[in-house]
Amino acid sequence: MLEITLLGTGSPIPDPDRAGPSTLVRAGAQAFLVDCGRGVLQRAAAVGVGAAGLSAVLLTHLHSDHIAELGDVLITSWVTNFAADPAPLPIIGPPGTAEVVEATLKAFGHDIGYRIAHHADLTTPPPIEVHEYTAGPAWDRDGVTIRVAPTDHRPVTPTIGFRIESDGASVVLAGDTVPCDSLDQLAAGADALVHTVIRKDIVTQIPQQRVKDICDYHSSVREAAATANRAGVGTLVMTHYVPAIGPGQEEQWRALAATEFSGRIEVGNDLHRVEVHPRR
């Protein structure tokens, strides 16, 4: 069984009720943080997961709303890990990830120096291990595998999605993307697909062109549902709602998705959990 927790379902616009885009996937004793939107560690703490308890951080792409809290994750995982010789924290992302991680650690350079000077048991900077992928196997440990495939969020490139499998169950995390063959293939037959969604029918009515621009590189609710249908997934889990879902509007979003997908549809707020079991 895999467990999905929507840690943050918000957008780049700060929302008092929604953290930035981030999803936690738990597979037995392993915990994977997919993207690091603002507020993610507080949301993770609410479900009993600390930064030092993460098995790996998976980044779908390097847009600011998806990596806003990366620095906090890196530093907090370091200062709250009390093992004598802690293993490096794996960061898995697209090309460019190593550069972003290096720059993030440099930005926190003074803080890192202060802590090393103050604590006798902190003698080196945060141990980080970066792996960059555009496609193929990315993880195989203790019965959990992760595979990567390219997505389409152009002009943001490259961007990737992840397929996590354990004990016969599978979850695909699409990240930000328009429909594309590579995502269909990655998600084929998966038990669950976590997909970011926007309401293009609403966004196109907003007067500012900069806001309307997001329509050409994100999937609408119906497009995400159509991807789920083509791929033959069991459950569609929607997240990263743009605009934010208002109180009592969840069924509107679910009904839109149901026009394209007849399977289980999950629409949830932050901390919404979905258990994923292998389909028989």
From Swiss-Prot:
Keyword flag Mitochondrion: no
Active site per database record: 65 (proton acceptor)
Gene3D superfamilies documented for this protein: Ribonuclease Z/Hydroxyacylglutathione hydrolase-like
Keywords: Endonuclease, Hydrolase, Metal-binding, Nuclease, tRNA processing, Zinc
Keyword presence, Lyase: no
Pfam families the UniProt entry points to: Lactamase_B_2
Gene Ontology terms, MF aspect: 3'-tRNA processing endoribonuclease activity; metal ion binding
Residues binding Zn(2+) 2: 65-66, 176, 240
Cofactor names: Zn(2+)
Cross-referenced InterPro entries: AtsA-like_MBL-fold, Metallo-B-lactamas, RibonucZ/Hydroxyglut_hydro, RNase_Z/BN
SUPFAM superfamilies attached to this UniProt entry: Metallo-hydrolase/oxidoreductase
Reaction catalysed by this enzyme: Endonucleolytic cleavage of RNA, removing extra 3' nucleotides from tRNA precursor, generating 3' termini of tRNAs. A 3'-hydroxy group is left at the tRNA terminus and a 5'-phosphoryl group is left at the trailer molecule
Binding residues for Zn(2+) 1: 61, 63, 153, 176
EC number(s) recorded for this UniProt protein: 3.1.26.11
Physiological role: Zinc phosphodiesterase, which displays some tRNA 3'-processing endonuclease activity. Probably involved in tRNA maturation, by removing a 3'-trailer from precursor tRNA.
Family according to the record: Belongs to the RNase Z family.
HAMAP family: RNase_Z_BN
Summary of subunit composition and partner proteins: Homodimer.
Protein name listed in UniProt: Ribonuclease Z
Species name: Mycobacterium bovis (strain BCG / Pasteur 1173P2)
